[in-house]
């Protein structure tokens, strides 16, 4: 079990935690608007909640794509979100120098999938002492995550969450191996596993400079993943996904957040009401 705040704990056996927000900080107003709706819905449904957003999308497909406001402005917006709503925050870092200042503001740091094997970045994240969400690289098998986990532990940090966002299947396509969740639990000491349903819905247009997506399938994929019994769900929503500056095709429309989460909570409650059944 990983303690995020005094009141929020993340465990595969506990009620799921929602790591939800927007993809990238487009503006302060959008961050506050989105967070307000997440807070309203999660408080109504009784779901533990962590706000998520990126201050820099450093791995965009095109050099011309919007990346975000940068670290300094991003941290200012995060402080405003915290002051207004009192929610914990998760965000990703891409450079070693970002780790310490970001850790002063946010509650959970995130290691991006494309950077998950970068040892110097792993060590810098570990040294913050903050919980770290490790995104499983699309090119890595679930069992190989234990090597990344071991790096963190040897660097002095065992406050780890593992996140699956799909695996490459051929070219320009991601699939989610539902059996992989159990493999990560067994090989990584039952660390909390969360499911990034938003980015698992990405697909690529080989001729395009941005990711496509399949948001019409978000309910199916989220139900399937959370039916395994996971510690959390990682989700992005937007008031107008077609106008989002990053990953709009995979984003849930914000006005569908309440009915969507009501279904996921009902499923999570049901799955975790079952007694353990070990077959070997």
UniProtKB/Swiss-Prot annotation:
Which UniProt keywords are listed?
Cytoplasm, Lipopolysaccharide biosynthesis, Transferase
- Could you say which enzyme class this protein belongs to? transferase
Q: Please give the InterPro entries that the UniProt record associates with this protein.
A: Aldolase_TIM, DAHP1/KDSA, KDO8P_synthase
According to UniProt, this protein's pathway is: Carbohydrate biosynthesis; 3-deoxy-D-manno-octulosonate biosynthesis; 3-deoxy-D-manno-octulosonate from D-ribulose 5-phosphate: step 2/3; Bacterial outer membrane biogenesis; lipopolysaccharide biosynthesis
Write out the GO cellular component annotations: cytoplasm
**Any idea where this protein resides?**
Cytoplasm
Q: Which gene encodes it?
A: kdsA
Q: Which family does it belong to?
A: Belongs to the KdsA family.
What is the protein name given in its UniProt record? 2-dehydro-3-deoxyphosphooctonate aldolase
Report the source organism. Pseudomonas putida (strain W619)
Catalysed reaction(s)? D-arabinose 5-phosphate + phosphoenolpyruvate + H2O = 3-deoxy-alpha-D-manno-2-octulosonate-8-phosphate + phosphate
Output one GO BP term. keto-3-deoxy-D-manno-octulosonic acid biosynthetic process
Q: So what EC number does this one have?
A: 2.5.1.55
* Database matches in Gene3D superfamilies: Aldolase class I (3.20.20.70)
Gene Ontology molecular-function annotations: 3-deoxy-8-phosphooctulonate synthase activity
Please give the superkingdom of this protein's source.
Answer: Bacteria
């Amino acid at each position: 079990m990983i303690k995020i705040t005094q009141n929020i704990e993340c465990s595969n056996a506990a009620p799921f935690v929602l790591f939800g927000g927007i993809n990238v900080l487009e503006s302060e107003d959008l961050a506050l608007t989105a967070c307000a709706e997440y807070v309203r819905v999660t408080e109504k449904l009784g779901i533990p909640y962590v706000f998520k957003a990126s201050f820099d999308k450093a791995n965009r497909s095109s050099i011309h794509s919007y990346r975000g406001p940068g670290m300094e402005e991003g941290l200012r917006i995060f402080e405003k979100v915290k002051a207004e709503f009192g929610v914990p925050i998760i965000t990703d870092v891409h450079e070693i120098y970002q780790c310490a200042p970001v850790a002063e503001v946010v509650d959970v740091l995130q290691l991006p999938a494309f950077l998950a094997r970068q040892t110097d970045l792993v060590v810098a994240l570990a040294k913050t002492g903050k919980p770290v969400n490790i995104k499983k690289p699309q090119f890595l098998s679930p069992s190989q995550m234990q090597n990344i986990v071991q790096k963190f532990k040897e660097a002095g940090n065992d406050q780890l969450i593992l996140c699956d966002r799909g695996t490459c299947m051929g070219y320009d396509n991601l699939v989610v191996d539902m059996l992989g969740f159990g493999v990560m639990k067994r090989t990584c000491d039952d660390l909390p596993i969360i499911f990034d349903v938003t980015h698992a819905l990405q697909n690529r247009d080989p001729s395009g400079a941005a990711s496509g997506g399949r948001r019409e399938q978000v309910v199916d994929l989220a139900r399937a993943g959370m039916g395994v019994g996971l510690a959390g769900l990682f989700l992005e929503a937007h008031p107008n996904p077609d106008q989002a500056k990053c990953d709009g095709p995979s984003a849930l429309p914000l006005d569908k957040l309440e009915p969507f989460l009501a279904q996921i909570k009902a499923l999570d409650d049901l799955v975790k009401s079952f007694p353990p059944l070990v077959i070997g």
